Amino acid sequence: MVQLTKQFGKIKVEVPIPHLLNLQVDSYKKFLQEGLLEPLPEEGLESVFRSVFPIEDFNRTSSLEFVNYKIGEPKYDQAECIAKGLTYEAPIRIKVRLIIYDVDSDTESRTVHDIKEQDIYFGTLPLMTEKGTFIINGTERVIVNQLQRSPGIIFEHDSGKTHASRKVLYSCRIIPMRGSWLDFDFDHKDILYVRIDRRRKMPATILLKAMGMGKQDILNFFYKKETYILDNDGRIKWKFDPSLFRKDIAYTDILDNDNNLLVAAGKTITKRVWRQMEASGLEAFEVDPSTVIGQFLAEDIIDTSTGEILAESAEEITEGLIQTFRDAGITTFTVLHTRGNDTSSSIRDTLVQDKIPTTEKAQEEIYRRLRPSSPPTPEIAASFFDNLFRNNSYYDLSPVGRYKLNQRLDNYENATLRTLSDNDILEAIKLLTHLKDSHGPADDIDHLGNRRVRLVGELVENQYRIGLVRMERAIKERMSIQEVATLMPHDLINPKPVAALLKEFFGTSQLSQFMDQTNSLSEVTHKRRLSALGPGGLTRERAGFEVRDVHVSHYGRICPIETPEGPNIGLIVSLTTYAKVNDYGFIETPYRVVRNGYVTDEIIHLDASCEFSEVIAQANASIDSEGRLIDDYVTTRARGDVLMSAREEVTLMDISPSQMVSISAALIPFLEHDDANRALMGSNMQRQAVPLLRSERPLVGTGMEVDVAHDSGSCILAEGDGIIRYADANRIIVSYDDPNLYPEFGGVRAYDLLKYHKSNQNFCFGQRPSCIPGQIVKKGEVLADGPAIRDGGLALGKNLVVAFMPWCGYNFEDSILISERVVKEDTYTSVHIEEFEIVARDTKLGPEEITRDIPNVGEEMLSNLDENGIIRIGAAVKPEDILVGKITPKGETQLTPEEKLLRAIFGDKARDVKNTSLKVPPGIEGTVIDVKVFNRRSGEKDDRTRLIEDYEISLMDSKEQNYIKSITQRMKEKILPLINGKQLGTTILGKGKGEVLAEENSAITPELLDSLPLKKLEGAFKSKELNETITEMLSQYEKQINYIKTIYDSKRGKVTEGDDLPPGVIRMVKVHIAVKRKLAVGDKMAGRHGNKGVVSCILPEEDMPFFADGSPVDIVLNPLGVPSRMNIGQIMETHLGWAAKELGQQLNNMVEQGVAIQSLREQVKSVFESPEISAEIDAMDDDTFRTSVQKLKKGIITMTPVFDGAGESEVWDWLAKAGLPSDGKAILYDGRTGEAFKNRVTTGVMYILKLHHLVDEKIHARSTGPYSLVTQQPLGGKAQFGGQRLGEMEVWALEAYGASYLLQEFLTVKSDDVSGRVKMYEKIVKGDNFLEAGLPESFNVLVKELMSLGLNVTLHQEEGKKKPKRTGLIDKE
């Protein structure tokens, strides 16, 4: 059925939103490498195994090699795992090869002695469901993606905050994925230090020397050289080098080779003059001798006659040193070029600080810093240093780290190298010194180019690798201790360390979270969440403001709106609608390519660092029909700023206005009119909306509702084109046209619908079929709606008629006044399912028993239990009702002679047992909807178990018959065209004696084929070819039927075989109770714009304000909640919703009044004003059209996408079309008096949600209950059945009133005076109302605290002072 919807969006978005769960599902698929043929690429699980294997023993006499792995089929399906509390996992088997070598003791060469290959069971691996979740111990969990600092290189400075001189100190850090961190930093004296793994710092040149560089090599790499010439006449000339510009004052006249003056003495050498000097071929010119003093030698100066070193490289030049050169006949010397704007002597100064002469000593020094306890030998130190950065086993940059390092250092030679090369370290130091000398900008660590996402596949891969490394140690030890020649591979491999780590990660890791299953939206957003917390991430306390803030690089990647409000603000964020994560883990967003002002259809995805140089136009930039940008100047983003750019400069364009927000924010209509803080609350509160009994799509939507519903996994979607064979409330069977879809079932697929399924948050999740038998469906069409989904679109709340006005103070401070009609009609009623579990164990005193025979319990309490002591389905229960009767043996006491006699007469019946039955906890009142009984495999089954098993088997039998019937129908349809009208070559007999189904020579008709069993057609025709074709088709049919029977036989077997219960458990019973929660005073409700409030009063319908036509409003909100909050979107929604409702009702009235079909068509077209809708209307036949219009009875569904929605003028137009006031205000009348209110009131239709903060779940009362062990005061909180705390402020209030007796009562007998409590009870029973207070227990606690400080406190009663005698609480006069 075509749903007529009004689209207000003007921008045509060609690119569909990528599937919302792809992030999780694709990542785990890539990890498992599902469906790929061998040899597998070295990534995911394959790369983990390859990184650890082969494993050799210490003597290299044997080696264990990995061949391949296979993942088997899971033992239980998802539904069974949830019901039985199991993990949805599959077994993994690995094939390994053990090679044993003979080693020649002289040459140490190895020859293969023996090879053993074996398949080994390697534990299990949790599988991801198609919804992107994991089922761990029966609960659905989500692995949240982690946002982490990317491996690579980061350059930073301290902004002058570290040293007192306020000097800006630069530093750089090389971060690997695995291995030692390397930090370089300058101190205030410009000495460069290095830290390895944040240990004690040392001069950076020690590291360079350890790499094998000498002092001269270091100077040659970091510095250019200048050459000076010493003349015989005492002058110093500088050898002209065009690349080293000197902005000096000329010391003498500088002449060219033809004695033409280039620059006069005392004049400044400019760049123009420098170019003239270069052009003239000048070789050298005289310089001021004082400018040479203080420079540093580039090379050692050696006296050629004696071989003596006159001066070492890096030595500072002095006047004396120059005189020494002249005396020794040295005519030229080179110095380090340290005088430029971007060069300094810091590396030379560091070399002077560094007193270590050789590579060996440098390696030993590094070893001492990192391993202070053990003294090194040169060999150990060299091997240790080599392993630090050059060994794959200890150091891994990862492809991401290498990519970022190469990108930052602008060096792409070692694109595949995963370790750190010497060149990387040298280039990093070179860039760091350049940044320091030129005061260059530091990297922004909060830029998304420097933060990457670790997806679920990578997180599990890391855990698997850690487990394998632990296992590797154990294998090596086993190979060395035992005689390997006699062993098989399975003797060496124990997969337990891997299994333990996986179990810990999925069960307790900070990133493995209990799925938020409040509604379909909360499920999807939880899977798209990014967390900066978790192992290897930030902590709440340490994270500063910068890392939490919205960054310019977040645009189109991370939503600036959706984040929690508490201490996690900015640390937990959401992906935007179109964002994708690339292979390196960087978030990408799509853009359309723009060339010469023309927008092309080419789409590219860019990460944040690639986007920096682009000029990007917004999605709402005006374009003509040819795709050219209309405006000469357009608003663009470039280099982190918003600019006006000429259209020819634009290189890219956004693809959609909603690309910058997450799906939660994209569901808020008129988001552009809301303040960001309120939009944040709105997007967060939609995730808390409770699925209602009958949900309703919003009249004012954004178009995102359908995407969320389809991708959430809560709906059932058609996987191809086909026809519905069977549909009821529990099951839909579809026959697909594509023969490749489910070929084993003959293209027929059965979908079982969820009914009364308990979600993680205890809500009732169910699916409703939205198709009928015989209906033709297209691929992607919705077959069944899920929870909070209606007609294939998200439906979290209800459309209510709202009035913004004060009403007797009942909407003070965001309170909400609501009509009783809403409660009466179950508009906001939701169903919650509570699960209760009880186990009968084998105790030391004997087994516990689930029974109806419970001591000291009256028959009335047992009335709803069956003969086995288990509650019957359908029973209405309230607090303290028994759900399952259970007795537990008590400890045997010394028996009296009478008890011994009773025991002798009645046997075991008289033994001591206590009642440990499962009872309904306080605050729960509902109906039992399901009971599951789990028995030990070998244990006896009671009648209830057998009854449940019989019911489940009968259910499976009927499902099997339905399935077979649908496949048979499909096969008959395939055969009919071949045999229609063909004559039978034989008589077909029925089962009964002499029963004839079809005579020989009779022609086949569709009716006859329907009445014949398919088997009877085999060889029944005269044509041999036809018989062969039919035989072949029937053999396929037989295979399909047998396959289905095998599946259902296996399911029936599982029902009757018993269960795997934990050790010591005999029987387990689970009871599900459905609780109906109607809207009540105290429930929290909210709109989509952050406008939230609590229901303060439910008013009778007749007292509510009403319109002139007598229809009352549903809800009254406070108008003061709008201006200060600045969420004007709610007013726009209210007005548009009113117009949509009125227009829908008017069109429906026209149908009911029998208006001519043609004029009705024209009217509908004029309302929608859309060529696409007009074409759809013209294509419909009259009946379909009428039905489509009648569906608009409750209102026209409108789509107003974020940042591209309906403007004010369009809302006014729609109000005018509906015949409503253009300002959206109406005269309302007081329901109590019938008089009109003084002013006109803003009214309309708003979408209101009921949130998961229900008063019934929060409120509780206590008379007596549990007390704290130490203080003897009542516990706190509903979960502990605690009481109210009377704190300091309450005591002050009572003191201020002088209510001393009341205060004494509160602080003693009503709280923690144990003996006083008992006495008070006794006195109340006797009718003596006299308060006799003793010492409160908390006073004793205080005394003990003081004693623990060494102060002995004793209490004395003073002599002669007697206690005052009183006869009652009030002295009698």
Swiss-Prot record:
PROSITE patterns per UniProt: RNA_POL_BETA
Gene3D superfamilies the record matches: 2.40.50.100, 2.40.50.150, 3.90.1100.10, DNA-directed RNA polymerase, beta subunit, external 1 domain, DNA-directed RNA polymerase, subunit 2, domain 6, RNA polymerase alpha subunit dimerisation domain, RNA polymerase Rpb2, domain 2
EC number: 2.7.7.6
Superkingdom classification of source: Bacteria
First-level EC class: transferase
Catalyzed chemical reaction(s): RNA(n) + a ribonucleoside 5'-triphosphate = RNA(n+1) + diphosphate
Nucleotidyltransferase keyword on record: yes
Key words, A-Z: DNA-directed RNA polymerase, Nucleotidyltransferase, Transcription, Transferase
Family: Belongs to the RNA polymerase beta chain family.
Subunit structure: The RNAP catalytic core consists of 2 alpha, 1 beta, 1 beta' and 1 omega subunit. When a sigma factor is associated with the core the holoenzyme is formed, which can initiate transcription.
UniProt protein name: DNA-directed RNA polymerase subunit beta
Gene name of this polypeptide: rpoB
